[in-house]
Design a protein with these regions (language model features):
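Unchanged
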Residues: 1-127, 239-240
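Left-handed beta-helix
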Residues: 73, 81-250
Length: 250
């Protein structure tokens, strides 16, 4: 999520509630059982909450992002009261309860958000970045994301390489077919290798004729010549850091 909090601050200052919570309407497959689902009235105030139970698979749920705007003196007062309890709660749960108790203003976020709670959701969130509208929503020019800079040489694409709908970091050598994938730095993809719908971390080497499909290869993984590594869209295969794969998997 990449939200402009200035807008949330502005709306928070116009309502009488001491707490504002940001929520997003989400499909059931994008929510886990640790997420809070909000009950919101017609005036956009929170009236209740519950943990997600997935009882209605077709519904959109008001999932709390656990992003809160609160009045500072009010929050300090509530936290001081909490620490004197025999079993004080963690801050996340305190804020969730306060949102219901004090009728928090509910701010609906309509941009891109990925709720990562499993290998499959992590895999899907990364591949979402291959869709232009989702990429631009997360990395908006008006709401910059600053990352650690690595000044390396550009990735080299050999004449025989075939690239479709993929993203590449710098410093790699690509001689292979790469479709619908995200390739990190210093990766070497040899001739006649095929990479489809996969995430390759830094330093991965895929040798000649190998096939990687619906997989997540951690740092330094080596896939030997002619080997197939294949998961599925629903259950991507994860190869641990530094592994050398000499036999077919999947």
């Amino acid at each position: 999520v990449n939200i402009d909090l200035n807008q949330v601050f502005h709306l928070h200052n116009t309502v009488d509630a001491p707490i504002t919570v940001v929520y997003k309407k989400m499909h059931h497959r994008d929510i886990s059982d640790v997420n809070a689902i909000l009950e919101i009235d017609e005036t956009d105030h929170v009236t209740g909450q519950r943990l997600f139970d997935g009882t209605d698979a077709d519904a959109l749920y008001n999932m709390s992002t656990d992003i809160f705007i609160v009045d500072t003196p009010w929050l300090i007062e509530k936290l001081e009261a909490e620490i004197h309890k025999e079993h004080p709660e963690k801050l996340r749960y305190i804020l969730r309860d306060l949102a219901v108790e004090h009728g928090a203003f509910a701010f609906e976020y309509t941009g891109y958000i990925a709720n990562i709670h499993s290998v499959e959701s992590y895999y899907r969130a990364n591949l979402d970045m291959l869709e232009t509208n989702k990429f631009m929503s997360l990395f908006s020019p008006n709401q910059k994301v600053y990352t650690k800079v690595k000044n390396e040489e550009p990735t080299y694409y050999a004449p025989g390489s075939q690239i479709k709908n993929s993203q590449f970091a710098s410093g790699s050598i690509v001689e292979a077919l790469v479709h619908d994938s995200i390739i990190s730095r210093r990766v070497h993809l040899h001739q006649r290798a095929e990479i489809r719908s996969s995430l390759l971390f830094p330093g991965v080497v895929v040798h000649e004729g190998a096939v990687v499909e619906h997989a997540i290869l951690d740092k330094g993984v080596v896939v030997e010549t002619g080997v197939t590594v294949r998961g599925t869209k629903e259950a991507p295969l994860v190869i641990k850091k530094g592994a050398v794969i000499t036999e077919d998997i999947g």
